[in-house]
From Swiss-Prot:
Origin species: Cereibacter sphaeroides (strain ATCC 17029 / ATH 2.4.9) (Rhodobacter sphaeroides)
Molecular functions per Gene Ontology: ribosome binding
Lineage: Bacteria, Pseudomonadati, Pseudomonadota, Alphaproteobacteria, Rhodobacterales
Protein name: Ribosome maturation factor RimM
Pfam families per the UniProt record, alphabetical: PRC_RimM, RimM
Record-annotated PRC barrel domain positions: 94-168
Cellular component aspect of the GO annotation: cytoplasm; ribosome
Gene Ontology BP, a term: rRNA processing
Subcellular location(s) per record: Cytoplasm
Function recorded in the entry: An accessory protein needed during the final step in the assembly of 30S ribosomal subunit, possibly for assembly of the head region. Essential for efficient processing of 16S rRNA. May be needed both before and after RbfA during the maturation of 16S rRNA. It has affinity for free ribosomal 30S subunits but not for 70S ribosomes.
Amino acid sequence: MTKTDRVCVGAIAGAFGVKGEVRLKSFCTEPTDIASYGPLSTEKGDRSFRVTLTRPVAGGLGARLSDVTTKEEADALRGVGLYVDRARLPSLGDDEFYHADLIGLEVRDTGGALLGRVHAVHNHGAGDILEIAGAVGREGLLLPFTRAVVPTVDLAAGRIVADPPEGLD
C-alpha cells in the first residue's frame, strides 16, 4: 500500500489519565467518525490500533487504543499520526478534498505566476488554510481555502489556481 492509498485521519496528542487512555486529535469532518474506520495504523504501518472513544476532552477526544494499557505506553505514542486505507473513507462530494490530496500540488495565481506548492493544510477553527511553500524568490504564503481565493483545484493536473487577496500576493 502506498502512502497515497492511506489518509491521516488523526493524531495522538498524548496520554490522558493514568490508565493508558489517550487524547486523540481527529482530522475528520465529524470528529467521532475516526473510531468507525476500523483499525488505524501508524504512518509506517508497523502498528495498528482499534479505537474506542471514551469522552470528549479539551482539545480532542478521550480514547482507548488496543494494546495500550499504561500511561507510559500512551505517552510514548504522542505525536503519532493515525492512518486509514482510503477505500474505507466515505466518498467525497464535488469540491471536497482530503488534505492529503492537496499537499504537494502546484499553486499558480490567476495570471499563471507560480506561487509555490501546498506544504500543509491547517484548520484553527475558522476554516482551512493552505500553507504555500514559496517558489524561488518568494516567501511562504497562507491562503484561506475558500472558493473566492482558490477558484480551481485540479487534482488530475496536480495544480491549484489561486486569487490571493490584495496585499498577499
